Swiss-Prot record:
It comes from Salmonella gallinarum (strain 287/91 / NCTC 13346). It catalyses: crotonobetainyl-CoA + (R)-carnitine = crotonobetaine + (R)-carnitinyl-CoA; 4-(trimethylamino)butanoyl-CoA + (R)-carnitine = (R)-carnitinyl-CoA + 4-(trimethylamino)butanoate. GO terms for biological process: carnitine metabolic process. The lineage of its organism: Bacteria, Pseudomonadati, Pseudomonadota, Gammaproteobacteria, Enterobacterales. This is L-carnitine CoA-transferase. CoA binds at K97, R104. Keywords: Cytoplasm, Transferase. Homodimer. One of its GO terms (cellular component) is cytoplasm.
Amino acid sequence: MNHLPMPTFGPLAGVRVVFSGIEIAAPFAGQMFAEWGAEVIWIENVAWADTIRVQPNYPQLSRRNLHALSLNIFKDEGREAFLKLMETTDIFIEASKGPAFARRGITDEVLWEHNPKLVIAHLSGFGQYGTEEYTNLPAYNTIAQAFSGYLIQNGDVDQPMPPFPYTADYFSGMTATTAALAALHKVRETGKGESIDIAMYEVMLRMGQYFMMDYFNGGEICPRMTKGKDPYYAGCGLYKCADGYIVMELVGITQINECFKDIGLAHILGTPEAPEGTQLIHRVECPYGPLVEEKLDAWLATHTIAEVQARFAELNIACAKVLTIPELEGNPQYVARESITQWQTMDGRTCKGPNIMPKFKNNPGKIWRGMPSHGMDTAAILKNIGYSEADIKELVGKGLAKVED
């Protein structure tokens, strides 16, 4: 396979990934591959560009390092070109409503006829099979959260609230990335392709597993948080200091012993309700739970965030200031690790945003390109798989492909 023009870098150099999907979930998977060195081709509709393009800034992050192909993959010669592209593809990711690709004639078996080693990842709200009531329904972030039991666990005691921004999309995209890599590892061992069925609601079901297990195995339903505090354990969650908010986790024998001395509760240590060796204080089951919260709130309210951080560092209590967005890039840890970076957009502007993560020591990722325009790489990609200028012109003339203006 001849690769498209791009630098060689990262742990996935030489891997070709193609994705068809809009907005966040599937493209996030593609973005991870692209930032780790894979050659990633982004398929867009010929008539209508990805709706993410209407956003002023986010697409510059989410579509960096990609190659843009505008092709009607379901019709006539456009379908033929897509299947020819699959012959040189390692991983194909698609996001749609249920088995939409199969309904339109592009089944796993058809894809494997063209490439027996292809890894196929299907990403949808409710999966590739199940009941007709759900399988073919559209789904976005909040839909997956609501159907999975994840949303109902979040928010405040008075009302559930979906965690933002777009948690289910990002979790599902990362699941597609890791599952596809696992499948690719096996394919290189066996030579046999794989198809992966990723239902967004099942991803969120798994992400919401912690408290669910108490219900499935005992009927206990965990209450939601109160003002950002852990529903079960005192000293865990969001707290207000004299000049802002922190989060903390009061966990550990030594940590509890020393913290209780500071807040005036040393006398309860060693009692039947808080015996020696206590590592967590249950907010409800421990009679002292409400008192711990009361004393901790009072102590924190009289100290600044800096004072609390300094003292908790001495006591080895996990704690962090709740940073505002403007505070991020000036934070010394962000600066030291270059967590925020800059890159050039295709029109020559400078864009600022999160850097590549995680950080590979021996084969680091790289930002080598901004977001491509609609159809920017169509001609180059089609030439790469054997199409002539005349062939490409014919596809464009029939409305089956779009090249950059």
